[in-house]
């Protein structure tokens, strides 16, 4: 056997061995394509598609810390020291398109903490904390069901951009409800709502009494039977501003209340608003007309002084003679982080002194600084 024959034989053996190994080899499957989270811009900034679905999700909220001093401008009592409170609000929003319209949900969970020095001796304070499901509703097109704020409060718009905005309360806040909002293409909108009644998430806490004049603890503003509270409203909005009105029927006390509000954009930086209200019950111990007496009026302005700083002013007065004035400057230190120093003044009338059970009340000055990070 010569060298040439030996080399040819060795090569043939190697080819045969390689073929046998290839026949025994396991073929690995191709890796699946990675599905990255997609941005969803159909419902605003911050939404993304939940993988494997056409539902868009947004996680947002805020963290805030408040420091208060001076008098409590709601009750008129002297704080005797600093009051501190903190809140973490976690919000989750979803949205998707269906054959019946846009399907949305919104939830907000609040974690609260507060520490107070408001004892008469000013020496010992009190602490409290708690967690609450503030909002949880489903919306399909214009139909909304769940826990939300009353249309009597939101349809006309909130009061001014101040922290102590409801020293003279303009109505209840959180409630269970079924509502329908019609939005036209020409700036007009209308709403009708059936509501369970509020839980007094506002500024004034009423004192309910039985037929013998004894105080009833733990009662809120909820309905006491099958008949719901009813709210209806109309609004027109344009580039110049808006005008809106609402009327509400309180099924518990069988009385009604109404509000009308106008907003005007003087310039891109300067806007003003005015709101008037009337209640047939003439008492704050109710779900909607929580001001004193028959009527109340609120007004305010906002001036965007710079890109970072805004000045806000609000004044209010009711039929019982209470006057409340608040002013602040909201300064955005960096995007998403705002510091707001605010000062408030309240003048109490004789009727409010009797309502609050404190004949020594006269006026109250209070201040607050809010630190808030929104995301």
From Swiss-Prot:
Keyword rRNA-binding: no
Molecular function terms, GO-annotated: porin activity
GO terms for biological process, alphabetical: monoatomic ion transport
Keyword list, A-Z: Cell outer membrane, Ion transport, Membrane, Porin, Signal, Transmembrane, Transmembrane beta strand, Transport
One Gene Ontology cellular component: pore complex
Subcellular location: Cell outer membrane
Topological relation to the membrane, as annotated: Multi-pass membrane protein
Effect of residue 80 to N: In strain: Fr11 and Wf21
The family this protein is said to belong to: Belongs to the alphaproteobacteria porin family.
Protein role: Forms passive diffusion pores that allow small molecular weight hydrophilic materials across the outer membrane.
Assembly and binders: Homotrimer.
Domain notes per entry: Consists of 16-stranded beta-barrel sheets, with large surface-exposed loops, that form a transmembrane pore at the center of each barrel. The pore is partially ocluded by a peptide loop that folds into the pore lumen.
Record-given protein name: Porin Omp2b
Organism, scientific name: Brucella suis
Lineage: Bacteria, Pseudomonadati, Pseudomonadota, Alphaproteobacteria, Hyphomicrobiales
